[in-house]
Amino acid sequence: MNKAAFQSQHNVNISGGTSNMKYFVSAGLFTQGGMFKQFNATDDFNFDYKRYNYRANLDFDVTKTTLLSVNIGGRIETKRTPESGEDQNQLFRKLYWAVPFAGAGIVNGERVVSNSEVLPFTGVDGLSSYYGKGFQTKTTNVLNVDLALNQKLDFITKGLSVKLKGAYNSEYANTKKASSSKAYYTPVANADGSISLRKYGTDSQLSYGEPDNGFSKARNWYMELALNYARKFGDHNVTALLSLIHI
């Protein structure tokens, strides 16, 4: 593993407005690299994470008694992980279980493991659970939108107002798996005392799963109607709230 991985975060915020409108806009980018060394692998199986987030808040004074608020936010994220056929906890657990006599690692661009015909117990090297096995990429798209209309009803009675709020939330995720295999070698002692490498397995190109592999989606609606009354009579504050909520 590498001693360090690159991480970056960037944000841009803009705010302003006029006498009848106020706005706030934000955009951000967060990236995080992986700790695994690639060695001579042609396909990048390392951990990688990218997230793009955005938000826009708009407030409109439609009239002196009417306020309209529009809020839009969301994020798009892509996460790549090594494809080992196991969960990530098991993947890192095998790194801890790796023993120094399990193999020589990467030698002249090839993965070399100990020969079980020579050693009674070879253990497992740290590369066995992920090296050359491909990767999986999960893309998630989250959207949150809410609208709020606040209308003062002082023409009926002072302190009376009505608020109508609606929200829409959605999340779509798609996981694509790319599998491959990579040959490994074991050292063999020849009769003349030299050492040769015996090959096991083959090198195969990436094979992607079905386009809809791991697809999921979810969405929900939220509606709220609230009648609010707040008024002060001398030293006394009187408040009342009637709310209807539909989810």
Label the predicted regions.
Residues 1, 30-40, 119-131, 197-209:
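Flexible, solvent-exposed coil segments and beta strand-coil junctions
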Residues 3-28, 32-35, 45-124, 136-140, ...:
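Flexible loop and strand-edge segments within Gram-negative outer membrane beta-barrel domains
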Residues 25, 70, 147, 162-166, ...:
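Membrane-embedded beta-strand positions of outer-membrane beta-barrel proteins
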Residues 39-44, 57, 130-136, 148-150, ...:
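Extracellular loop and loop/strand-boundary signature of outer-membrane beta-barrel proteins
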Residues 41-45, 85-96, 178-188, 194-195, ...:
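Flexible, surface-exposed loop regions and adjacent strand-edge segments
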Residues 245-247:
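Conserved small/polar residues in nucleotide/adenosyl-binding loops
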